[in-house]
Swiss-Prot record:
A motif ('HIGH' region) lies at residues 122-132. GO terms for molecular function: arginine-tRNA ligase activity; ATP binding. This is Arginine--tRNA ligase. Its EC number is 6.1.1.19. The gene is argS.
Length: 577
């Protein structure tokens, strides 16, 4: 049930009948103030201008041809030509009842697509740090949402699992006569990496051996491939622990690292040469793009193969786009990475399209995000200025949540208390990020994110638990409740019903734009509207049984919507708090 979409289609039909072009847009939006209705159509004036008509006169023509009697109880022309739409309470009751009985709360799957979502993407032989948090949780929320909308989602964890560093690591492991790579902890690997780099920089014989191992690895040498596989496996086991703690849906089967595309790179570069897109420049192969200019105003050169024959990230990203279209048969590919990679992605995809590897119908979308900052406004670091490990951040979240819950004199069992601590601790970190517009930087603040007030995980989780407590106080049979009639008479009931039916609008926006903060804002508004409804409209102490059951139905759909919405964000709920 997408009210905005339904109204847009019907008003556009009326606009076309009234003389507007088929390309017109009704521009239907939720109204900001009750006196302007529940929705407004703002596209009348632009269409009237094209036709050379008075906007208010054209608006009346649209109303004369508009079939909304079942949905709207009142339509009015306002100002220079806006159409205000007041929804019909009877229609609202019908749709609320339908949403309650539908497994997806009334959201229907439409236009199923195959969507590749590239997110998280940590490096092998290194531990995940806070810089991986945003891609991991934003990408996962969008993946969950698109699946909920009925799409076929392919998760692609584009891990950094190829390059010269593996030659160094294999050589150093051999030097240390360590045949137990599979038993090493990841922090050991990080130490090995530092030592390997030191040897590589200081010992030419070691460096030569490392370079030879890279060549052997790329050539398929069994020993080198086995050691490389161990390093990858150890890394991904540790990463999986982080994913599980974060309640992120990525698994080992979703790994599509750089190595996957490596066999494609020579033929792609050769093809770019044949097409005349890539030209030799000082021994390297370069694609010059007129669409991007360098400081001198000349076409910018993008290297696809280095002088020594090595390939670059751009070449890999071209191959990835080609693979996702040709092999995975995707309709869309979404990449969640730092804003600083925007130009790089644009250039790689421009070359991909120029080479004809994907058609215009294949959507390549860079869902960029800003940085996580400390309270000083600088990139989030440890007190000593080091990189914050993701596991350490999650440990601290649990520690702080433990203190918070222990301070609240709760009547919970130890198991219940631990579940609340885990849900609030991890949920707070995730929600604080997801509730911010992904394209902006945001300040990481423990006090704000763990607060039970404002747009935070604890507030949302408590709002859900509070509604659950209403049902714990009654013995109403769920079947009987669903069968009970719903009536909407009070303004608070009406406001809540409309907000509940706007769930799909928020969910569809997340799926289209990759913006989980829209869903967070919706859920926060819903929780606030329910709180106002609860204060002004007695439920268990309603004036009669019919009103009680009717309001319980609104409470039930609110509970289901909050739970489903938080689930799409990857935020756990608890039954008691």
């Amino acid at each position: 049930m997408n009210i905005q979409s339904i109204l847009s289609d019907k008003i556009k039909q009326a606009m076309v009948i009234a003389g507007a072009d088929q390309s017109c847009d009704a521009l239907v939006r939720q109204s900001g103030k009750p006196q302007f209705g529940d929705y407004q159509a703002n596209g009348i004036m632009a269409a009237a201008k094209k036709l050379g008509l008075n906007p208010r006169e054209f608006a009346q023509k649209v109303l004369d041809n508009l079939q909304l009697s079942d949905i709207a109880e009142k339509l009015e022309i306002a100002g220079p030509g806006f159409i205000n739409i007041f929804l019909n309470p009877t229609w609202l009751t019908t749709e609320i009842s339908a949403a309650l009985s539908h497994k997806n709360l009334g959201i229907q799957a439409t236009n199923k697509q195959t969507v590749v979502i590239d997110y998280s993407s940590p490096n092998v032989a290194k531990e995940m740090h806070v810089g991986h948090l945003r891609s991991t949780i934003i990408g996962d929320a969008v993946a969950r949402t698109l699946e909920f909308l009925g799409h076929n989602v392919i998760r692609a964890n584009h891990v950094g699992d190829w390059g010269t560093q593996f030659g160094m690591l294999i050589a150093y492991l051999e030097k240390m006569q360590n045949e137990h790579a599979s038993e090493m902890e990841l922090q050991d690997l990080e130490a090995f990496y530092r030592e390997a780099k030191k040897h590589y920089d200081e010992d030419e014989i070691f460096a030569e051996k490392a370079r030879n191992y890279v060549v052997k690895l790329q050539g398929g040498d069994e020993y080198c491939r086995a050691m490389w596989k161990r390093l990858v496996d150890i890394t991904m086991q540790q990463n999986q622990h982080n994913y599980d703690r974060l309640n992120v849906t990525l698994t080992e089967k979703d790994v599509m690292g750089e190595s996957l595309y490596n066999p494609m790179l020579p033929s792609i570069v050769e093809d770019l040469k044949k097409q005349g897109l890539a030209v030799e420049d000082d021994g390297a192969l370069v694609v010059y793009l007129d669409e991007f200019k360098n400081k001198e105003g000349d076409p910018m050169g993008v290297i696809v193969q280095k002088k020594d024959g090595g390939f670059l990230y751009t070449t890999t990203d071209i191959a990835a786009a080609k693979y996702r279209y040709e092999t995975l048969k995707a309709n869309r590919a979404l990449v969640f990475s730092d804003t600083r990679q925007s130009q790089h992605m644009q250039q790689a995809w421009l070359i991909t399209r120029k080479a004809g590897y994907v058609p215009d119908s294949f959507s390549l979308e860079h869902k960029n995000f800003g940085m996580m900052l400390g309270k000083d406004g600088k990139p989030f670091k440890t007190r000593t200025g080091g990189t914050v490990k993701l596991a350490d951040l999650l440990d601290e979240a649990i520690e702080r949540a433990t203190v918070l819950i222990n301070e609240k004199n709760t009547n919970l069992s130890n198991d219940e208390k631990q579940a609340v601590i885990e849900a609030i601790g991890i949920g707070s970190v995730k929600y604080a990020d997801l509730s911010k517009n992904r394209t902006t930087d945001y300040v990481f603040d423990w006090d704000n994110m763990l607060s039970f007030e404002g747009n935070t995980a604890p507030y949302m989780q408590y709002a859900y638990t509070r509604i659950r407590s209403i049902f714990n106080k009654t013995e109403i049979n769920s079947t009987a409740l669903l069968a009970a009639p719903l009536t909407i008479k009070d303004d608070k009931e009406r406001t809540l019903a409309i907000k509940l039916l706007q769930f799909e609008e928020a969910v569809q926006t997340v799926g289209k734009e990759g913006t989980p903060h829209v869903l967070c804002a919706y859920l926060y508004e819903l929780a606030g509207i329910f709180s106002s409804f609860y204060e002004h409209c007695p439920i268990l102490n309603a004036e009669d049984e019919a009103v009680k059951l009717s309001r319980l139905k609104l409470a039930l759909l609110t509970e289901k919507t909050l739970k489903q919405g938080l689930e799409l964000l990857g935020i756990k709920t608890v039954e008691k708090m």
